[in-house]
């Protein structure tokens, strides 16, 4: 529709060969090789984010807001630098919520909406990574904002 949001581009990837650096055993025990996860998470978020931006046919400078997985501020800072997008364009709420895993992106987007950081027609990059190693990104054009 003319005033609705739109999915402009996306990326989904996995690197199963990295399964052993971040996984949960049966029973719920989580194993993480911290420094290796940091390095691979930055690569995954950067490559997936760039692929979604390319898929959308836009440039990093056109991205108004980045809503990343809230695992670690250092991962976000490094990924933003490598994406060529100022850190100020990222939403960071991990200091309020900690790492809420798969819920971190929608929670961060909710904070961005509540704080009026999202405007009609903004191009927003959603980008995350997780165990397995997996990564996913989407560029959306935000629709009309009511209220």
Residue locations for each model-derived region?
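Phosphate/pyrophosphate-binding loops at sites that engage ATP/ADP/AMP, CoA/4′-phosphopantetheine
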Residues: 47-64, 112-117
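Short, functionally important structural connectors and interaction interfaces within domains
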Residues: 14, 30, 50, 89-92, ...
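Non-catalytic alpha-helical scaffold/packing segments enriched in small hydrophobic residues
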Residues: 21, 40, 44-52, 62, ...
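Condensing-enzyme catalytic core mediating Claisen C-C bond formation in acyl metabolism
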Residues: 1-43, 47, 129, 141-147
